[in-house]
Amino acid sequence: MPRSPSKSSPRKGSPRKGSPRKGSPKRGGKGAKRAGKGGRRRNVVKRRRRRRESYGSYIYRVLKQVHPDTGISSRGMSVMNSFVNDVFERIAGEASRLCQANRRRTISSREIQTAVRLLLPGELAKHAVSEGTKAVTKYTTSR
């Protein structure tokens, strides 16, 4: 269905009124040569997609250690990722406040441990501290 020449074009520039029709010799058809630089392509810079960081692979690994025959949906993974981010931010914030209170500039494993004890309730804090200590020991011996 051809457009009527009276309608304005959505393109930028002059209105459609004075422009020639598709097949007219003024405009040139498919095989018409362009004026200027002969057939060179512009360097189009392809924008890289921003990487989305997540704890997904680590959550999946832990899931397979605990329940090897169980899967997780993408929605469930999103919830778990949000949960890990939230706990991480809470621990980091509390450790930061502890450093400020003790007039220190560096967050050490001691501040992290104290923050975990303050944030997590009872038995959960004890297990988290023992697992954290185990991980730090494993890391220092591997170096």
UniProtKB/Swiss-Prot annotation:
Leader sequence residues: none
InterPro entries assigned: Histone-fold, Histone_H2A/H2B/H3, Histone_H2B, HISTONE_H2B_site
Ubl conjugation found in the keyword field: yes
Bias-annotated ranges (Basic residues): 9-52
UniProt note on tissues of expression: Testis-specific.
Post-translational modification as stated in the protein's UniProt record: Monoubiquitination of Lys-138 gives a specific tag for epigenetic transcriptional activation and is also prerequisite for histone H3 'Lys-4' and 'Lys-79' methylation. Phosphorylated on SPKK motifs 3, 4 and 5; which may regulate DNA binding. Dephosphorylated during maturation of spermatids to mature sperm and rephosphorylated at fertilization.
Residues with attached carbohydrate: 130
List of residues that carry Phosphoserine: 14, 19, 24
UniProt-recorded Gene Ontology molecular function terms: DNA binding; protein heterodimerization activity; structural constituent of chromatin
Location of the motif SPKK motif 5: 24-27
Free-text note on domains in this protein's UniProt record: Contains 5 SPKK motifs which may interact with the minor groove of A/T-rich DNA sites. Phosphorylation of this motif may regulate DNA binding. This motif is reiterated in both termini of histone H1 and in the C-terminus of plant H2A, but its presence in the N-terminus seems to be unique to sea urchin histones H2B.
Annotated family: Belongs to the histone H2B family.
Annotated PANTHER family: HISTONE H2B
Entry function: Core component of nucleosome. Nucleosomes wrap and compact DNA into chromatin, limiting DNA accessibility to the cellular machineries which require DNA as a template. Histones thereby play a central role in transcription regulation, DNA repair, DNA replication and chromosomal stability. DNA accessibility is regulated via a complex set of post-translational modifications of histones, also called histone code, and nucleosome remodeling.
UniProt name for this protein: Histone H2B.2, sperm
